[in-house]
Amino acid sequence: MIRKVIIAGVMLALISSCKMENPFLTESKAPFGAPEFDKIKTEHYLPAFEAAIAEAKAEIDAITSNPDEPTFENTIEAMEYSGQTLNKVAGIFYNVNEAHTSDEMQAVAEAIAPMMTEYSMYVSLNAPLFERVKAVYEKKDSLNLEKDQLKLLEDNYKS
């Protein structure tokens, strides 16, 4: 019962936070683009995850819909750079949740778990994406890749 009340409270906070500035969805003014922890509130996380997942999916869709022949740059490198906003939001959330958890943070964690699982499946089970990775992998010997590039290609192919 109390968990339902907490989740309802988080959802209400989420609705009101849509009207305020979300520090995850704006460029940080802190040195080196560091997170502005003093501006981050619990209600910012869920909308930030939603926006970041939508952005990451769009980046994956751009890779799979690219009409050009798959190359290391337009497929593997593009995958490596996709999801950076999601990585930032998730990195901050999971670390703060571990170091300074609360019932509200746990409610957010419960809400984002299925979203993150769905996104992970969206990438790992994406047949057109795998076909592009496979096409690059099959010509790896002729690409003159550096060791780190080859490792990245092999990791993407095997995952």
Regions found by a protein language model. Name each.
Residues 18-159:
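Zn2+-dependent metallopeptidase catalytic domains
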Residues 1-21:
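Bacterial Sec-dependent N-terminal signal peptides
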